[in-house]
């Protein structure tokens, strides 16, 4: 248990599990210099579970600031990356009494971006599984899926998002 500040992004190699004690007793946030970076970049056969990710922002110029993305050139040999029992809590940079989560800022950290175009050509699939995950992402997209990626979304929720789930048919990508 505890609160941890880490330099984002955290790269999770193939077959590795990042496991907290429980989502309410382990909180992960970025260092001040990495607040607008992605939190986790996942390879295939990896897992992140039992923690809360918070206090990061979205950088629209670099399309960074997601809790979860595929690692560049990722591969899935046996199973997709798996995210379980995780809460993502973000807010915009400008908050007020009438907008306590910064919905109007439009720069709160986002939940996940799944882009099948960055999969390695020999990857079995370009998918990610979410189970019992909550994205509190005010004024921004909670989950975006594009370019042939797949998502399993089991018992998950988005709150305060401008778009809870956005699925875009891209022009590139594995199995797209």
Q: Which ranges hold each PLM region?
A:
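Glycine-rich beta-solenoid repeat tracts in large extracellular/virion proteins
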Residues: 9-11, 26-29, 35-44, 60-77, ...
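N-terminal extracellular ligand-recognition/capping segment immediately after the signal peptide
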Residues: 1-17, 21-36, 52-57
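N-terminal accessory/assembly segment that mediates macromolecular interactions
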Residues: 1-2, 154-156
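All-beta strand scaffolds that present successive hydrophobic residues in beta-strands
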Residues: 17-21, 47-53, 78-85, 100, ...
């Amino acid at each position: 248990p505890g609160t941890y500040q880490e330099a984002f992004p955290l790269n999770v190699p193939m077959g590795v599990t990042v496991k907290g004690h429980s989502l309410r007793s382990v909180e992960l946030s970025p260092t001040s210099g990495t607040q607008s970076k992605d939190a986790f970049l996942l390879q295939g056969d990896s897992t992140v579970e039992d923690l809360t990710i918070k206090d990061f922002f979205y950088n629209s110029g670099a399309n960074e600031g997601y809790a979860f993305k595929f690692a560049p050139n990722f591969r899935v040999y046996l199973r997709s990356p798996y995210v379980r029992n995780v809460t993502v809590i973000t807010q915009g940079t400008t908050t007020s009494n009438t907008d306590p989560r910064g919905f109007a800022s439009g720069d709160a950290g986002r939940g996940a971006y799944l882009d099948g175009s960055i999969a390695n050509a020999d990857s079995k699939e370009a998918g990610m599984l979410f189970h019992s995950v909550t994205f509190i992402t005010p004024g921004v997209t909670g989950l975006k899926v594009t370019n042939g990626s797949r998502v399993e979304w089991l018992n998950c929720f988005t709150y305060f998002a401008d778009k809870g789930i956005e699925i875009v048919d891209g022009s590139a990508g594995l199995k797209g």
